């Protein structure tokens, strides 16, 4: 890889790989008014129409650049606060009320984003110029099956999203950073680990220890890039066995990330109700304590920590994921370059 390509790959990874679905908000965060967000370095306005259908377009009025998120929700379109220009969910200007027969009307001026809502989260497709149409959003069993109950926890951290991915791909830190937690106080402080291929990615696991601590983690690519792990739970923590977590690290910009963690257990009927009650009234606070430990460490890493590392065997899974991401970034850039390069003409 040349230095020029390396820089471009680094820049792409800093704000996130394209051509994936990313969770951008919990559902409860979007109310009647348009909402402006920044994700993957792109400014987006989201809103719901009268039927609850979601829309997402660039947060920029094509007239003079005002934020559409400061304007009004008109159902299937938003109106700019500055001059009242109306734009629909496809990014097309439908009305310029201040003048007659404005040539701006009817033009698709803004990028629109495919958007889906599931399991209490809002997902947006971030496609590059070659992939405006989304791939299917295929979620892991814990989110796709009604046999599982899930609750979403999300937080914003002041660090690059790659550090959040590194953190989840590092099971060994559970025995140290989270050693006094309600769920990761047991197990060996030393372990041998291995990488295993899965149908959609990799699993990184401790050898000879399972269902004792944070003993394994999986990363998979199924239209979105998700991570899965399980934490053993004692019977006093309610029915459903081990507690599964489905995690995402969505870039906000180069220096901020929003993490999403769906907490899942396989329960139904009265057991589901019991677990939800226990979680909301007892367990949720304990999990926030664990998450805050990760938060504090990641926000206080040494400057440019990734450029000054000495990795060892426990970092193998993390290193494999880093290389996987680099290869995907190289492939995305190469595909864009191939289209942009003028074709040779024969004389």
Task: Show the residue positions of the predicted features.
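Rieske [2Fe-2S] iron-sulfur-binding domain
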Residues: 2-4, 9-10, 16, 23-149, ...
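Short, positively charged
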Residues: 13-17, 268-270
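Short small/polar-residue motifs
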Residues: 20-24, 42-44, 109-116, 186-194, ...
């Amino acid at each position: 890889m040349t230095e020029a390509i390396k820089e471009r790959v680094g820049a792409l990874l800093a704000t996130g790989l394209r051509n994936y679905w990313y969770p951008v908000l919990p559902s409860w965060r979007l109310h009647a008014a348009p909402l402006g967000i920044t994700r993957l370095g792109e400014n987006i306005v989201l809103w719901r129409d009268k039927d609850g259908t979601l829309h997402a377009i660039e947060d920029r009025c094509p007239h003079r650049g005002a934020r559409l998120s400061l304007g009004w929700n008109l159902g299937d379109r938003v109106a700019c606060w500055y001059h009242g220009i109306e734009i629909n969910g496809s990014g097309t200007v439908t009305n310029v009320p201040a003048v007659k027969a404005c040539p701006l009307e009817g033009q698709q001026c803004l990028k629109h984003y495919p958007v889906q809502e599931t399991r209490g989260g809002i997902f947006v497709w971030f496609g590059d110029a070659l992939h405006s149409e989304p791939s299917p959003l295929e979620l892991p069993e814990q989110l796709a099956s009604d046999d599982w109950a899930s609750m979403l926890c999300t937080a914003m951290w002041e660090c690059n999203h790659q550090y959040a991915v590194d953190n989840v791909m590092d099971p060994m830190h559970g025995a140290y950073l989270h050693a006094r937690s309600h769920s990761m106080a047991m197990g060996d402080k030393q372990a041998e680990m291995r990488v295993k291929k899965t149908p959609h990615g990799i699993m990184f696991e401790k050898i000879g220890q399972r269902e004792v601590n944070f003993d394994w983690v999986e990363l998979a690519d199924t239209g979105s890039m998700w991570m899965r792990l399980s934490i053993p739970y004692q019977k006093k923590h309610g029915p459903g066995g081990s507690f599964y977590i489905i995690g995402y690290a969505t870039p906000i910009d180069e220096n901020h990330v929003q993490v999403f963690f769906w907490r899942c257990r396989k329960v139904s009927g009265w057991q589901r109700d019991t677990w939800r009650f226990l979680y909301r009234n007892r367990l949720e606070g304990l999990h926030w304590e664990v998450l805050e430990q990760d938060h504090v460490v990641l926000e206080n890493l040494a400057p440019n920590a990734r450029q000054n590392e000495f990795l060892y065997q426990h970092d193998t899974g993390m290193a494999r994921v880093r290389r996987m991401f680099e290869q995907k970034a190289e492939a995305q850039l190469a595909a864009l370059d191939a289209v942009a390069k003028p074709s040779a003409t024969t004389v």
